[in-house]
């Protein structure tokens, strides 16, 4: 055995004792324990009522609608966001300008205001028609109140708002692709669309997935805003119940529990996707070692 091999085999890892961290952890655990005990023993929380309504059919139906709203709005938002992000790619200043104005407007106005606006769009356009501008021929599709229902207004508002955020996320992912990858694709004779499908978007996924997962979770919670449009989502369902029995806090806790369950499931899916697309990019862990005092012979 050489001297270098003896040195490597005699290395020992010594962890520093951090007394302050240990004391802080113990104190934090005590505070959390007292807080949980107070919540569990406080009769004003109405835990029996929570258990009675946790699996109520009206609550479960509202939760199902919340999931549907999240899935449809995110799908439409991602699809439109991809288009807007591609429009921002340098090459056509008109497309880039239109995309930039769209992102500026929808990110700069509150989502609740947008939902109420789309719900009252009939005040501006009582009849929805397709046709040429400036008095050209048109085809009347129908009344705005009939075509844009409260559920349609909610999906429209959520999707258009989400597209603005997804456009920036996808654009940042596209910008993260190394220029050398693009040059290699061009050298192989790839067209612009094929380069986007085969080179840019697959590599951008590693950057896009983490913030997209956060957006899905945010969308799930943001669907609670549609309750102002009298749509029977999860929040509106519990509101309808506590407006009859006046058990406000217990019913709000029911909605919180289901939101936590759904967001936890989405977080698990997000972490799995990050592991899948992050293979080969995980940084190596560096362990600091302390040399042994044993002399080398």
Report the location of each language-model feature:
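Transmembrane alpha-helices and adjacent helix-loop boundaries
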Residues: 1-297
């Amino acid at each position: 055995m050489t001297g270098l091999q003896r040195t490597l085999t005699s290395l020992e890892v010594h962890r520093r004792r951090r007394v302050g961290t240990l004391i802080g952890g113990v104190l934090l655990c005590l505070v959390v324990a007292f807080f949980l005990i107070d919540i569990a023993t406080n009769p004003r929380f109405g835990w029996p009522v929570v258990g009675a309504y946790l699996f109520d059919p009206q609550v479960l139906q509202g939760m199902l609608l919340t999931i549907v709203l999240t899935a449809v709005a995110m799908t439409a938002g991602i699809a439109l966001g991809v288009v807007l992000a591609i429009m921002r790619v340098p090459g056509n200043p008109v497309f880039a300008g239109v995309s930039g104005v769209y992102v500026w407007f929808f990110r700069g106005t509150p989502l609740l205001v947008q939902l109420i606006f789309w719900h009252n769009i009939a005040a501006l356009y009582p009849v929805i028609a397709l046709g040429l501008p400036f008095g050209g021929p048109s085809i009347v599709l129908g009344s705005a109140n009939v075509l844009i229902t409260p559920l349609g207004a909610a999906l429209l508002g959520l999707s258009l708002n989400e597209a603005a955020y997804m456009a920036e996320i996808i654009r940042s992912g596209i910008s993260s692709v190394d220029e050398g990858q693009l040059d290699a694709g061009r050298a192989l004779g790839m067209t612009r669309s094929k380069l986007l499908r085969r080179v840019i978007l697959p590599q951008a996924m590693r950057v896009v997935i983490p913030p997209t997962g956060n957006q899905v979770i945010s969308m799930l919670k943001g669907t609670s805003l549609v309750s102002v449009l009298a749509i029977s989502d999860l929040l509106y369902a519990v509101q309808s119940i506590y407006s009859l029995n006046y058990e406000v806090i217990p019913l709000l806790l029911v909605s919180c529990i289901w939101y936590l369950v759904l967001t936890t499931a989405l977080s698990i899916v997000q972490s799995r996707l990050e592991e899948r697309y992050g293979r080969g990019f995980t940084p190596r862990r560096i362990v600091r070692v302390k040399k042994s005092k044993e002399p080398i012979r």
